[in-house]
Amino acid sequence: MMLNLLQYPVIKTPKATRLLENNQYSFDIDKKLTKPQIKKLVEEYFNIKVLAINTHRPPRKIKRSGSAPRSKRVIITVSANINLLG
């Protein structure tokens, strides 16, 4: 099932906390997912309309050279009256 590819919400960083005020939510996801797949997954799971998706791969830690990041971080923008986490 594709739901296993959506790992967890990111709310522990200061930037992610600021983004919540703008109706943007951060998630760590499987690094192989594309933007259309992410949009379909989020819209079906949360039953909402996604306005925009931004993705990036966080830099890996210096201590662990030789290994690629295991996840991709995605920022999902939704309508003003929707709350995904509450």
Swiss-Prot record:
Keywords, ordered alphabetically: Plastid, Ribonucleoprotein, Ribosomal protein, RNA-binding, rRNA-binding
Keyword Plastid: yes
GO MF annotation list: rRNA binding; structural constituent of ribosome
Main location group: plastid
Disulfide feature: none
GO process terms (BP): translation
The keyword Plastid is annotated on this UniProt entry: yes
Recorded superkingdom: Eukaryota
SUPFAM superfamilies noted in UniProt: Ribosomal proteins S24e, L23 and L15e (SSF54189)
Role noted for this protein: Binds to 23S rRNA.
Entries under HAMAP family matching the protein: Ribosomal_uL23_B
Assembly information from the UniProt record: Part of the 50S ribosomal subunit.
Similarity comment text for this entry: Belongs to the universal ribosomal protein uL23 family.
Protein name per UniProt: Large ribosomal subunit protein uL23c
